[in-house]
């Protein structure tokens, strides 16, 4: 979905839940697209290996695949703008049959299609939900400071079109 719907916020909450709760995955990896292979390498133990940092992309992919092939993992990818060949980076897609998961956020349905990903659409909030979120973002004393403010605030919340990011900013 378009920007401001809360895709990144949702993915961060998923990541935080994995960090603070018991789960049945061997490793949870949050990776930025720009440094995807290095981020994966860090999470599986290659961060201190100076030799690994100097390896080619293909050699890193072999190393990543050798570690992840024996693990049940969750790979969280935020803000994907174009399709990524994860196998080329060393991500063993056959593990998805054994319960590993890859979750990505994107603004492009086409990226989901090209990566054969199941789509979960996020949409704007209904007015009641948007108004509730807006009220949580401002002090109650501000709303109560003048009789015209609640009406103006509700109009402003409506103008945000139910986009969580717009309501928070």
What are these regions (language model features)?
Residues 12-19:
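A conserved segment at the C-terminal end of the G1
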Residues 7-8, 78, 163:
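Short, conserved phosphate/pyrophosphate- and ester-handling motifs at nucleotide-, phospho-/glycolipid
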Residues 40-55, 98-100, 108-169:
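Non-catalytic, charged helical/coil tracts that couple and regulate nucleotide-powered enzyme cores
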Residues 31-94, 143-148:
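Central P-loop NTPase core of STAND/AAA+ ATPases
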Residues 22-23, 66-70, 93-98, 113-114:
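Conserved catalytic network of the ASCE P-loop NTPase/AAA+ motor domain
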Residues 1-11:
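Walker A/P-loop nucleotide-binding motif
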Residues 76-79, 99-107:
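Structural recognition of the conserved hydrophobic beta-strand(s) that form the central parallel beta-sheet
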């Amino acid at each position: 979905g378009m920007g401001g719907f809360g895709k990144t916020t949702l993915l961060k909450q998923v990541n935080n839940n994995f960090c603070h709760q018991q789960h049945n995955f061997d490793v949870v990896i949050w990776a930025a697209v720009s440094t995807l292979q290095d981020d994966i390498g860090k999470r599986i133990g290659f961060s201190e290996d100076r030799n690994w940092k100097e390896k080619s992309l293909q050699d890193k992919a072999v190393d990543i695949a050798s570690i992840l092939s024996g693990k049940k993992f969750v790979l969280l990818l935020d803000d994907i703008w174009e399709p990524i060949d994860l196998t080329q980076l060393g991500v063993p897609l056959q593990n998805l049959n054994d319960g590993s998961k890859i979750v990505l956020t994107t603004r492009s349905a086409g990226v989901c299609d090209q990566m054969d990903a199941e789509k979960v659409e996020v949409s704007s909030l209904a007015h009641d939900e948007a108004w509730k979120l807006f009220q949580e973002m401002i002090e109650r004393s501000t709303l109560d400071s003048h009789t015209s403010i609640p009406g103006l605030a509700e109009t402003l919340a409506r103008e945000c079109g139910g986009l969580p990011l717009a309501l928070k900013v």
